[in-house]
């Protein structure tokens, strides 16, 4: 059962500087207040990084600073040998929400993206997993609360909208919006088949029951289908 949450809470940065997130919209605050009034599930946010030191330096602190009325952890899975990424993670390692692990260099003949997601999910302490790309940043400190308030007992998947930054070209922003609107419509009709993976929640038990990417780990692409 799928709950689609169509709200531009996530903004993907395309060659742009950080925006000022000091102010939030009334609708966002209202949703956050509703979330604080209910029992929120524990959430594990999984971020898979590949040469994303700059993006993590810019966006990871915003993820760690989420105002969430429940327990949450942030799991970053990076590649061993990426010294810049490791340095960023070490600088933020004092944060109680952060946990990171490294993929061994020997795992070359398989999809490293799928392997990273699998490792992150297995390391998660929570039933609910949030998949996030390192190039994405929350548009407010209530992003996680607004997403997680949809994690009800009768749902296994929560799909959120993510958009390009305002500095991206118009046709790029339109194309992304069009594709996601189509994907969300299919999900609402119980025919979810793909997502960008940048703002997606799934139950760990479901992922493990389906054995994750076991049958397609040797295929480089397809992690979002």
Regions found by a protein language model. Name each.
Residues 93-112, 116, 146-214:
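Long helical/loop segments within the catalytic core of UDP-sugar-dependent glycosyltransferases
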Residues 218-225:
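Acidic donor-binding loop at a coil-to-helix junction in glycosyltransferase catalytic cores
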Residues 41-44, 73:
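Cell-envelope/extracellular polymer assembly enzymes that use nucleotide-activated donors
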Residues 61-106:
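Acidic donor-binding segment of Leloir-type glycosyltransferases
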Residues 1-35:
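N-terminal membrane-anchoring/stem segments of glycan-assembly enzymes
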Residues 133-149:
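Acidic donor-binding/catalytic loop of UDP-sugar-dependent glycosyltransferases
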Residues 86, 90, 113-122:
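Short, conserved alpha-helix that lines the donor NDP-sugar binding/gating region
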Residues 129:
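Short aromatic/hydrophobic "clamp" motif used to bind/position activated sugar donors
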């Amino acid at each position: 059962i799928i709950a689609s949450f169509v709200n531009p809470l996530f903004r993907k940065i395309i060659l742009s500087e950080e925006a000022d997130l000091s102010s939030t919209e009334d609708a966002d605050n209202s949703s956050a207040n509703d979330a604080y009034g209910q029992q929120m599930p524990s959430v594990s946010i999984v971020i898979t990084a590949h040469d994303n030191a700059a993006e993590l330096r810019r966006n990871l602190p915003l993820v760690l600073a989420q105002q969430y009325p429940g327990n949450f952890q942030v799991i970053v899975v990076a590649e061993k040998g990426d010294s810049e990424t490791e340095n960023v993670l070490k600088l933020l390692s004092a944060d109680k929400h952060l946990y990171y692990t490294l993929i061994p260099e020997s795992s070359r003949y398989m999809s490293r993206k799928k392997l990273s997601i699998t490792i992150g999910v297995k390391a998660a302490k929570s039933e609910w997993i949030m998949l996030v790309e390192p190039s994405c940043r929350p548009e407010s400190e209530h992003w996680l609360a607004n997403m997680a308030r949809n994690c009800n007992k009768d749902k296994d998947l929560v799909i959120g909208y993510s958009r390009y930054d305002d500095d991206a070209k118009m046709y790029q922003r339109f194309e992304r919006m069009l594709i996601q609107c189509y994907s969300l419509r299919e999900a609402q009709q119980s025919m979810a088949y793909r997502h960008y993976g940048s703002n997606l929640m799934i139950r760990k038990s479901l992922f493990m029951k389906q054995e994750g990417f076991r049958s397609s780990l040797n295929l480089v692409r397809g992690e979002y289908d």
